[in-house]
A protein has these predicted regions:
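Fungal secretory targeting signals
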Residues: 1-20
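Flexible, surface-exposed loop/gating regions in the mature catalytic domains
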Residues: 22-311
């Protein structure tokens, strides 16, 4: 990790020097972060995760090599789950304060992240959502346990689902079974922006057999699945993984925000700045150079304090 960080910093400095040598000191260096994964877990305060004996992978493996935020919150009074997933995608909740399906909470707005990415200059930025326990044969607009549609923000937007069409080709192409992620990593065919939703057993939401401990179940899932990302070519060559929680179990947090990247400060760095989900959204927008900053992302700071090189 230390070697990768030194190489990233050297590359950043080289780009800056080359720009000056070319007679254009104001030209920004090329963005170093190329691929983003966002993993959203469920309903835990950071105080329940950090130091927990039920989360040995997070505490003993991830945190020592990662950066993390100590003051990351869900937006004020933004509960239950769905409003927070929508916020990560659009910087606001559109007045939604329930977990209703897209049948009752469909949005016609095109002002959300993946549409900005699709329409980005230069041919767009590719995106894909990996949802655990969907079939991949249709647009997953309804709950099919252990898949919870409220944890899949994209299907709430008409321009993703062709206005709630279960046979939407665009939706089916972009919202895929999590089980396909391993193949895509091996083939180096992951999208530039990837959103990962474990099922409601593995995201620390439900008590499920055989473990019957929410935190331990989620930690076990991360230990099993995260290494395939961290060992991938896409991660090593300019990747970042953001692991966060949708909302706190008590009040608004703090909740977890863990950043893993060759460009993160890492080494257990604990940032003290205050953020909410708008900061994550702004950070992703800055990485891919898309505007306008959506909703409260326009007022939030980005997460660059957690990086040694950004973006």
């Amino acid at each position: 990790m230390k070697f990768l960080q030194m190489m990233a910093l050297a590359a950043y400095m080289t780009g800056s020097i080359n720009a000056i040598a070319a007679g254009n000191p104001a030209a920004p260096p090329e963005h170093h972060i190329k691929t983003v994964w966002v993993i959203v877990m469920e309903n835990q305060n950071w105080s329940a995760i950090k130091g927990s004996k039920f989360a040995p992978y997070i505490n003993q493996t991830l945190l020592p090599q990662a950066s993390h935020a100590e003051q990351y919150f869900n937006p004020p009074n933004n509960h239950p789950s769905l409003p927070n997933y929508i916020w990560i995608e659009a910087g606001k909740n559109f007045g939604i304060l329930d977990d209703g399906t897209p049948l009752v909470n469909r949005q016609s707005s095109t002002q959300h992240l993946v549409t900005l990415l699709k329409n980005a200059p230069g041919g767009g930025v590719s995106w894909r959502a990996y949802e655990e326990n969907i079939s991949g044969k249709d647009c997953p607009l309804v709950n099919k346990y252990p898949y919870g549609v409220r944890h899949d923000p994209f299907v709430y937007f008409d321009d993703v689902t062709d206005r709630g069409n279960i046979n939407s080709a665009y939706c089916i192409a972009h919202i895929r079974p999590f089980e396909e992620l391993g193949r895509d990593l091996v083939n180096n065919s992951v999208a530039q922006y990837n959103f990962i939703t474990p099922n409601v057993c593995n995201d620390m939401h439900d008590y499920c057999p055989p473990i019957r401990n929410q935190i331990k179940q989620g930690d076990t899932w991360l230990a099993k699945n995260l290494p395939q990302i961290l060992n991938s070519q896409a991660y090593r060559n300019g990747g970042v993984v953001f692991i966060t929680w949708d909302e706190a179990a008590l009040a608004d947090g703090p909740i977890g925000m863990i950043v893993l990247s060759p460009f993160a400060k890492g080494n257990g760095y604990a940032g003290s700045l205050r953020y909410d989900h708008g900061a994550l959204l702004r950070t992703v927008e800055e990485i891919f150079g898309v505007t306008p900053y959506l909703g409260n992302a326009a007022q939030q700071s980005d997460l660059k304090d957690l990086f040694s090189v950004f973006p």
